[in-house]
Regions:
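Long alpha-helical, hydrophobic tracts
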Residues: 1-52
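Extended, helix-rich structural scaffolds rather than catalytic motifs
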Residues: 47-215
Length: 215
């Protein structure tokens, strides 16, 4: 079974068919470990022949918290996520594209894991929105606040394990980024958050990543 098939099998259980949020989210660490083991085995037999490349994340629109989530996952799994903006209709309408740059197996793992964690985050997000609607009559800004909190928790947990597994981004990935996006710049995303929603998202993210129910 190839690495992509193993990851797909690992992430096959979904919330919709009976897997809990916590069980599904704990797969993130398992995917990281699988990627780490995969590259160690290739190195041991001298067969690490993959080359870095980029592919577009299939998404109609991307919110700021989703950009941070995909960037977090990519950087902790030997890849980079680049956001590119294109204007249409006389430079009036802007569409954002997210490119994942990395080795083939790593890219596939990043995209699969992002799609899984994004779904999980949205489940908690809806609960938080419903809470604020019932308590305060509206949920303005709650979704993004929860999303940023959730993403921060994922970042802390995945960064910790990436260091333990020595998941180092190959130089070829940085070279490919420069080839594809020679004018790329790093920009800081500043947002104002609802403290309760942010803390709820962060708590749920940490709880999900620490559960070993499907290990």
């Amino acid at each position: 079974m190839d690495i992509k098939a193993k990851i797909e099998k690992l992430l096959a259980k979904t919330i919709e068919n009976g897997c809990t949020v916590e069980e599904a989210a704990s797969a993130a660490k398992m995917v990281q470990r699988l990627i780490g083991k995969y590259h160690i085995e290739l190195a041991e037999v001298g067969n690490e022949t993959e080359t870095a490349d980029g592919e577009v994340l299939d998404a109609k629109s991307v919110r700021k918290w989703e950009i941070r989530l995909i960037s977090t996952i990519a950087r902790n799994m030997r890849c980079e996520a680049i956001v590119s903006h294109r204007y249409t209709a006389g430079n009036i309408n802007r569409k954002s594209f997210v490119y994942i740059v990395g080795m083939d197996a790593d890219r596939k793992a990043v995209i699969l894991l992002y799609e899984k964690l994004r779904k999980i985050c949205k489940v908690g997000m809806r609960k938080e929105q419903n809470y604020h609607k019932s308590m305060y009559g509206n949920a303005k800004g709650i979704a993004d606040s929860y999303g940023f909190g959730f993403t921060m928790a994922i970042k802390e947990e995945m960064t910790k394990q990436a260091k333990a597994l020595v998941l180092v981004k190959p130089k070829e990935v940085d070279d490919k980024v420069q080839e594809l996006f020679p004018n790329v710049k790093t920009r800081r995303v500043n947002v104002s958050c609802n403290a309760h929603a942010y803390d709820s998202g962060m708590s749920d993210g940490h709880s999900a990543m620490s559960v070993s129910a499907i290990e």
